[in-house]
Amino acid sequence: SWYDNGDQKVFGSQSPTLLDNGNVLLFDNGSERPEGNRSAAVEVDIKTGEVVWEYVTNHTASFISYRQGAVQRLPNGNTLITSTHGGHLFEVTPEKKVVWDFVSPFFAGEGKCVATEEDAIPLEFHKNGMKNLVHRAYRYGADYPGLQGKDLGKKSPLVEGCPSFYKEYVKAETKAEAPAPK
């Protein structure tokens, strides 16, 4: 964990990424935080140690991943966040507005429309988790080589008979697409 003059700022860092501006973007699990558990996406100026951007939510239950998690800065400046526990993926703008939101409907390999208590992970294994864990997600642009020749306009439900599991709040910029992960 990262400390600033003895005051701990990050409680379980994951997915550190060096950005083009020299800063580091990371996922902070936020577990065991004295003020209460809450996860965050954090950008740190490594020269000064200052947090220059951070995404958190006022509703801790909506964004908490006790272990694991990931972040990806997209070419349009937005950040893709993977909150592992609960299978929650979402994209936020630099102004911290959520523009895309997805919850995995796959619980231990089975597609379900509605999660039940049986889908929760026993507390002795993970805190605050469901069996729809997603370790990390990447956003690929339409020009990604693995997508060449694919019909990207074709849409089908993830789980038959269920509603859409994502919400696009505003049309996200797609001019500059994310490069392939390294």
Region spans (language model):
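Histidine-/acidic-rich catalytic cores in large beta-rich domains
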Residues: 1-182
